[in-house]
Design a protein with these regions (language model features):
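Catalytic phosphate/metal-binding cores of nucleic-acid and nucleotide-processing enzymes, i.e., regions
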Residues: 1-103
Length: 103
């Protein structure tokens, strides 16, 4: 962890802060990891699906030491051929990681 990045605790706290920051920057954010039933149905889908100005951002929230499950890695690999200027997939470990998407 770098000195400039504050500790936010668990994955839920990191995710909540990322959602807050992206929404403040004008993104429409759908949280897919809300409850146990939803998590089971959408097991490998990224935690956040975000839309703004024709751009779609898929975000997997992890703690600095958090590891992606194999299904999440597979989903990311399956998405790679479809990524372009209007679709991006990111793993964010700190709320500050969302800053590149503010403009």
């Amino acid at each position: 962890m770098t000195e400039s990045k504050a500790p936010y605790g668990n994955e839920s706290a990191i995710q909540a802060e990322i959602v807050k920051r992206l929404r403040a920057a004008g993104w429409y954010v759908i949280v897919t990891s809300q409850d146990r039933r939803t998590r089971k149905q959408l097991a490998d889908i990224p935690d956040l699906i975000c839309f703004r100005c024709g751009m779609t951002l898929l975000v997997e929230c992890k703690t600095p030491m958090g590891q992606m499950r194999q299904g999440q890695v597979d989903f990311q690999c399956d998405m790679l051929p479809h990524l372009g200027r209007s679709l991006a997939y990111r793993v964010m470990r700190y709320p500050e990681d969302a800053e590149e998407w503010y403009d």
